[in-house]
Swiss-Prot record:
The keyword Ribosomal protein applies. GO terms for cellular component: plastid; ribonucleoprotein complex; ribosome. InterPro entries: Ribosomal_bL36, Ribosomal_bL36_sp. The gene is rpl36. This is Large ribosomal subunit protein bL36c. The keyword Ribosomal protein applies. It comes from Epifagus virginiana.
């Protein structure tokens, strides 16, 4: 899980989701997991 100020989709399978007032990226590739912090 990478924590970044600005997150973006890395590939086509990445999905942006809002959870508990946080924006996270979920992907089939575990390296693409991100969270805004």
């Amino acid at each position: 899980m990478k924590i970044r100020a600005s997150i973006r989709k890395i590939c086509e399978k990445c999905r942006l989701i809002c959870r508990r007032r946080r924006i996270i990226v979920i992907c089939s590739n575990p390296r693409h997991k991100q969270r805004q912090g």
